[in-house]
Amino acid sequence: MRPTLLRLANASGPLPLSVSQASVQLIPPIPLYRRLLRAHRLLPVDMRYMGDSYVKSEFRLTRTTDNPLHIIGFLSQWKMYLDEIESSLIRPDGRKQGQAVEWRGKKLDTGAFEKLSTEQVGQLYELMHATKDVWKSPEQIEREANSAGVSPVNPNDPTTAGNS
């Protein structure tokens, strides 16, 4: 490599001109991982545990990835997710909103939906049905079970576990 190219490669890029450009910058994997887990502390407990386990498994699975394009795509998508969570759970004045605000995500963009493969659409459909009762209170679930003539069974309750 020529010395001029080497100097160009080592030169730092220009500073971002706006906040939106600064937020697009990538964060190294370990600080990003820690910030994601820290942001999940503001979610409701069940959402936090689900999010934490998903983040941990995804980072664990991609630990051995060598392809720079995959790494950049992975880090940029997680950074966008982090920005989305932080913007919806932290007030503009910097104070945390805490448990009072429930984060429900956002609607799936039609352009992104059209890019999904048939297998991914099937997985999304299964996820939709698996999570349809997430936002219902236990009382609502019990009422629906009673109206259907089914006794609600809690698998963690030893008194009802064998009564199904």
From Swiss-Prot:
Keyword field: Chaperone, Gluconeogenesis, Mitochondrion, Transit peptide
GO biological process terms held by the UniProt record: carbon utilization; gluconeogenesis; mitochondrial respiratory chain complex II assembly; regulation of gluconeogenesis; succinate metabolic process
Location, primary (coarse class): mitochondrion
Coiled coil: none
Family matches, as InterPro entries: SDHAF3/Sdh7
Name assigned to this protein: Succinate dehydrogenase assembly factor 3, mitochondrial
Tree of life domain: Eukaryota
Any matching Pfam family: Complex1_LYR_2
Transit peptide: 1-51
